[in-house]
Every structure is written in C-alpha cells, then in structure tokens.
C-alpha cells in the first residue's frame, strides 16, 4: 500500500501521482493504426457528462483515461467509480489519482442510483478505487450502492468491478450478499509481472477471491481481465486462463495496455489484432462462457450487451 500525504504546504497542490514524480520517463513505441480512436464530441457524450457532473459522480472512464469513452458515453453508458477519486494503491499501469482518500460520502449510493435512472441504464457498472484505509475496504459502501440501485431501478442489472479486499476479513461476503448480477475483479497481468505492475496485490489472493464468489453464490456471473503488452509471454497468458477456469470464472477480457503518462510502466509491445483473436479462440476452448479480446477491450466495454450474451450462454449450457 502507498499512502502519500502533504503535511507541509498551507495549500498544497499535489501531483496526481506523487510516488511517480521522480521516476525517469519510460518511453513506449508509437501507437499502431489499430489503436487510434476518435475524439469524443457527440450530443450523447455531452448529455452523459452533464448527468455525471450534476450528480457529483466520478467515472473510471475519465479517471483512467479510457480510450472508449467517446463511444460509450455517446450511448449513455458510463462506469461509476465510487468511494472517491483517490486510490491507496499505486499500480504502475493506472492513471487514477493516488494518496490519502477523503471520507466516504454517505449519500453516494443514492446519487449513483439516481444517475442510473436518469441515464436509463438497463445494465450499470460500478467500480471503485482501492480503500485500504477502511476497515472493510469499502465493502459495505459497495453493498449499499447495489441496494440503492435495486430500489431505484429494479429492472436494471448490476455489474461491479471490485478491488481485492486484501486483508479485509468478511468484506467479500458483504458484497456478495447484496447479490450483484456480475462480480468482476481484474487480475490485470500475469503473475511474473506483479512486482513491477501491481506490487500492492497478490495474484493467488485475487484468484481465490473470484473462486469464493462462486462458492458463496453460484448464480452470480464472475468476470476477470488482464492487459497485454506489459512484457508477458503467451504461455503465461494461457496459464492465467487455466487459473481462472479453475476458479470457475465465466467471462475473460483481454486488452492492450496503453501508457497513461511517461511516468507509468512502458508499453513493451503492441499485440496484434490477430494475436488477440487467437487468445479469444483459445479462451473459448478452455470453457469460458464469454471471451472478449481485442486491442481496445476494456472491462466495462459493451458490458450490457455482453451480459445478455452471458445469460444466453449459460442457458444453453443448462439445457
């Protein structure tokens, strides 16, 4: 865990990533043509941004610099990020602000539910920063948000993307008891890259977290994702697939890592669209109900459409 607090300046202006300020620049190769996206400028994008701001909400779409924000917000699809905009971890790949977070906003679950209603979402995705500073890692806040959405928008299906609740006994059980439709927790990368990419996390703890969800409530769909282009080998990606299937995970996403700033981990290489297609094919042969693998695949991209496909795939399996 990395927690940074400025106790010197009267009115401190903190850098977004203070722990990275003194690092040397990490240079990445130029982006290939298949990575480029259009700048967001549509009416739907503007409407979504207005609703998000009016409700005082944070989205991972903005905070993480997602390349799909224009496409998703044009369709009024947004991923709400609860518990503030500041994370207690300092992962080498992530653009979310790091440091000591503010206290939880007690009304936030209702604000998220109201924004879900205003956007007319049939499927909503809720994620969060890591909150190692809280006794339960924010689990009760997650559960309250799920319950608030259920009350305000009973027909809306709910997908959550959670932190790992490392060393937070009982936290996972609180979240699962609120019965989200999809429980997503991303592994982010292969085990050999954890010390440099995701040093505050533990690979097999994350695998066990996903496995426990299914043990507690087998009806909940489970989902996980990784980025490629961080120096991993193909055989390591295939091993991650096997580990996830051993935990009975239903849905795998694989996308290209893109460097947020030069202070973040460099892109080691750009994986080709054909390689992504190969990963998707192999993933299906290993038994996943859904696999989404492409350069611009992200955890919440097309989440609503993918949830419908998950339901169909499970129904076919149970016939």
From Swiss-Prot:
[4Fe-4S] cluster 1 binds at residues 61, 66, 72, 300. It is found in: Cytoplasm. This is Lipoyl synthase. It is an enzyme of class 2 (transferase). InterPro entries: Aldolase_TIM, Elp3/MiaA/NifB-like_rSAM, Lipoyl_synth, rSAM. One of its GO terms (cellular component) is cytoplasm. The gene is lipA. SMART domains: Elp3 (SM00729). Binds 2 [4Fe-4S] clusters per subunit. One cluster is coordinated with 3 cysteines and an exchangeable S-adenosyl-L-methionine. It catalyses: [[Fe-S] cluster scaffold protein carrying a second [4Fe-4S](2+) cluster] + N(6)-octanoyl-L-lysyl-[protein] + 2 oxidized [2Fe-2S]-[ferredoxin] + 2 S-adenosyl-L-methionine + 4 H(+) = [[Fe-S] cluster scaffold protein] + N(6)-[(R)-dihydrolipoyl]-L-lysyl-[protein] + 4 Fe(3+) + 2 hydrogen sulfide + 2 5'-deoxyadenosine + 2 L-methionine + 2 reduced [2Fe-2S]-[ferredoxin]. One of its GO terms (molecular function) is lipoate synthase activity. [4Fe-4S] cluster 2 binds at residues 87, 91, 94. Keywords: 4Fe-4S, Cytoplasm, Iron, Iron-sulfur, Metal-binding, S-adenosyl-L-methionine, Transferase. Its cofactor is [4Fe-4S] cluster. Pathway: Protein modification; protein lipoylation via endogenous pathway; protein N(6)-(lipoyl)lysine from octanoyl-[acyl-carrier-protein]: step 2/2. Residues 8-29 are annotated as: Disordered. Its EC number is 2.8.1.8. It comes from Nitrobacter hamburgensis (strain DSM 10229 / NCIMB 13809 / X14). Gene3D superfamilies: Aldolase class I. Residues 73-289 form the Radical SAM core domain. Belongs to the radical SAM superfamily. Lipoyl synthase family.
